[in-house]
A protein has these predicted regions:
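PG/GG-rich flexible active-site loop of Rossmann-like NAD(P)H-dependent oxidoreductases
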Residues: 8-9, 55
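C-terminal substrate-binding subdomain of Rossmann-fold SDR/epimerase-dehydratase oxidoreductases
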Residues: 31-162
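Short beta-loop-alpha junction of Rossmann-like oxidoreductase domains
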Residues: 12-15, 127
Length: 162
């Protein structure tokens, strides 16, 4: 049996998640509503928008799951992440690039999150790679562009045409 801990998944089919949907989803919708994307200002050791996450595209999560399906002899608990952290600025710039315009605005870091917020997360993907996964991961800029295109075309859902 395999249990995977999926880290910061983004991509099509997440509309139902509401406030828990990915940053890309929220940035895209912020741009539609306000023609700008808002990120947290500097906090602690991290500059404005420089907080990071190990963002993984939903297509890559599917590839990892198929890898385990194809290898029933493998068992254990695995992190399903890329092993590389990217900044929120990276995602925001990808969304703004998609639209060809817009503003990146930094908002004060919320008092309620101070001392509780993780400014850096990154998966340890070494166990996944040691198990033999070699399917790679989609470049974050490419994935953000693809996801924004799906949001444009279908509102965020894959269809036979998308």
């Amino acid at each position: 049996d395999v249990c995977s801990s999926d880290l910061n998944v983004y991509g099509p089919q997440e509309n139902h998640k509401g406030k828990m949907a990915s940053m890309v989803f929220h940035m895209y919708n912020q741009w539609l509503a306000e023609k700008k994307v808002k990120l947290f200002d500097a906090y602690g050791d991290y500059g404005a928008g420089e907080q990071t996450r190990d963002f993984i595209y939903v297509k890559d999560v599917v590839k990892v799951n198929f890898f385990f399906w194809d290898h029933p002899e493998i068992s254990g608990v695995f992190n399903c992440g890329t092993g590389h952290a990217h900044t929120f600025n990276t995602l925001a710039k990808g969304v703004l690039k998609h639209f060809g315009s817009g503003e990146l605005e930094y908002v004060p870091f919320p008092e309620v999150l101070k001392g509780k917020y993780q400014s850096y997360t990154q998966a340890d993907a070494s166990k996944l790679l040691a198990a033999g996964y070699d399917g790679g991961f989609t470049d974050v800029d490419e994935a953000v562009a693809e996801y924004c295109a799906v949001l444009d075309k279908t509102g965020g859902y894959y269809t036979h045409e998308a």
